[in-house]
Structures are given as C-alpha cells and as structure tokens.
C-alpha cells in the first residue's frame, strides 16, 4: 500500500514539474543587488533586469541589500526558496569573500546556481578634484607620503574596491586609511563632494564622472587601456607589471533551482546580452560582455570556482586576517 502511494506521489510530482517550468514566471521576480543603489552592480542589474523582464513577461524588482562586502545580499539569496523568483547579481567579491570571511552563512561554490556570466572590465584609480596631483606619478608619491593621512573608499571587506586597495597597498608598501561604505555609489558621492580623497572603482561607475569632470583619473587596472579613456595609462605599463584587477559579474539563483527554470532564466539573460541597446550602454561604460558561447551556466560555475581559488591565494599571500 505504502509503495503504491509513494509511486503515485512520484508520478504526480513528475507530471507537475514540467507544468511549473512551463508557467514560470507567473509572478514578479526579485533581483538582489548586494550593494547600495547607484553603484556599478546596481547599474548593471537594472539594465539586465529590464531586458529580462520584457523577455519573461514579468516584472523584475531590484532590491538593494548592501553590507559586508556583498555577503549580506548573497546570504539573503542563498536562504531564498529555490524557485527562480529570487536572483542575485554579484561580481568577483563573491569569490573573494570565501576567503576574506570566516563564518559565511553559505558555501560560495555549492549554494548558488550560476545562470551566466554578464560582463568584465577594469577598475580605475580616481581622486577628488581638490587633490593637488595631476599625474599617476604625483598621485603615487602623494599616497606614499600621506599613508594613513589619505582616505580610500571601499564597498566593504571583500568588495572589488577593497581587493584593489589591498593590491595597491602591497605594491606601494604603504597603508592608507580605508573608509567602508555600503557600496561604491555612496563612496563616489563623497568623492565628488570632496569628503573622500580617493577610490578604486569600476569603469561603469567612474567613466561618467570622469567625463563630467567631477573626479580625477590616474590609471586603469587592466593590462590594456580603456577605449573611452585612451590617454589614461594602465598600472601595468606604469611600472607595476603584476598589477591587474578585473571585475566580472554573473547572475545566480539559489542552489536547487529546477534545471528547466535555470535554463529559462539563462536564455533570458542571453537575450539581454545580445540587445544592441545594452551592448551600446556597456561600451559607454567601458565594460564588455563575455563572448557568446562562453557565458552560460557551466562557464559561470567554472569561473566562480577558479576565482575562489585565485583570490584564496592572493589573500593568503597578502597576510590578511579573515574577518567575522
């Protein structure tokens, strides 16, 4: 009797799963941005979310859950029901956080279903316009002399800005005053107003402010110059051959999300990444999408795993003590 009941239940579940996938989504989806509004991840999340919303026929609501270098928003996603209605956009900080934090409430590699890679691009080292330096050489000399007298913003431990700062301090053999924010959006506001001295931020956030003359750029952290800032040198060409920090974003769902739902969301992301308007916006912001055929769920999982290993080595070598 029990065997027949279990068999019947299995048949019902098997029949219902395709229906669930076919009708998904039948209500709004929440896309968690683990940093404050106005920052690079927020900008990208809204761009991608708007396109995916049109493809899926449902509203995608952006929820900014900042704090702890992006781990607060990641934890919220990991705890969510694995039904495709809670998504996460995150960048390299998700991978680095696996080493930077001792007691994360999730397993970085196991607790997320990658939906696809979105974009990749460099950071730009910038300062307030009131700083009396004009060139990278002058800025570096000023940082070395000032030490903790100069303030650099970060989006918290484990954020890309924090990792960039970590590498910069190691290369210059200096410790400066790091000011944590809930995202580089608020940090950029303080930089523009002159309350913050310097910041290492993504091109998506910094290029519009540079072009508007509201902040001063010194160098990019990629191996090649940025097309939108052709006169801005790379740190690599400026005497720091081992300095490279490249940001990458990916989209995730909680572990256990049905494969059919993962594929449907991944397909909607692919539509967004082929949208000419989004590609034009990416170009304006100095970032590029991952190549077609190299950005699906499997590629995103491989990228996450390799980046966890990469940053574990970098952070361990730096002597950084993991935080709680």
Language-model segment annotations:
Residues 1-9:
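Bacterial N-terminal signal peptides that target proteins for export
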Residues 16-18:
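N-terminal signal peptide c-region/cleavage motif recognized by signal peptidases
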Residues 21-110, 149, 173-202, 209, ...:
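N-terminal (or domain-start) structured segment
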Residues 26-28, 237, 259-324:
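An extracytoplasmic/periplasmic, membrane-proximal ligand-sensing/linker region
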Residues 79-85, 99-186, 235, 248-281:
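Hinge/capping helix and adjacent helix->loop/strand transition within the periplasmic-binding protein
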Residues 89-94, 154, 184, 201-206, ...:
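Beta->alpha turn/N-cap motifs
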Residues 107-117, 175-179, 197, 207-245, ...:
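Short beta-strand->loop
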């Amino acid at each position: 009797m029990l065997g027949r009941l279990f068999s019947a239940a299995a048949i019902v579940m098997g029949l219902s799963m395709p229906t669930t996938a076919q009708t998904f989504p039948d209500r709004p989806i929440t896309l968690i941005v683990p940093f404050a509004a106005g920052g690079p991840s927020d900008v990208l999340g809204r761009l991608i979310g708007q396109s995916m919303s049109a493809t899926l026929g449902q509203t995608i609501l952006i929820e900014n859950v900042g704090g702890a270098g992006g781990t607060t928003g990641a934890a919220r996603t990991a705890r969510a029901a694995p039904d495709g209605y809670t998504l996460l956009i995150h960048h390299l900080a998700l991978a680095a956080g696996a080493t930077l934090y001792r007691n994360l409430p999730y397993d970085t590699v196991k607790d997320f279903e990658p939906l696809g890679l979105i974009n990749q691009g460099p950071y730009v080292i910038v300062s307030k316009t009131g700083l009396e330096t004009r060139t990278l050489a002058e800025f570096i000399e000023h940082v070395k002399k000032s030490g903790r007298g100069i303030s650099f913003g970060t989006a918290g431990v484990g954020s890309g800005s924090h990792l960039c700062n970590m590498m910069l301090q190691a290369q210059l053999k200096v410790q400066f005053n790091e000011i944590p924010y809930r995202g580089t959006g608020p940090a950029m506001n303080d930089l523009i107003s002159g309350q913050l001295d310097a910041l290492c931020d993504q091109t998506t956030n910094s290029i519009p402010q540079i072009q508007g003359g509201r902040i001063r750029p010194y160098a990019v952290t990629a191996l090649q110059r940025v097309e939108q800032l052709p006169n801005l040198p790379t740190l690599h060409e400026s005497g720091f051959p081992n300095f490279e920090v490249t940001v990458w974003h990916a989209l995730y769902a909680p572990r256990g999300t049905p494969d059919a739902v993962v594929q449907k969301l991944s397909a909607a992301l692919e539509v967004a990444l082929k949208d000419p308007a989004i590609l034009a916006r990416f170009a304006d912001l100095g970032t590029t999408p991952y190549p077609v055929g190299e950005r699906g769920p499997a590629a995103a999982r491989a990228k996450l795993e390799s980046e966890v290993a990469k940053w574990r080595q970098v952070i361990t070598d730096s002597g950084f003590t993991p935080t709680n």
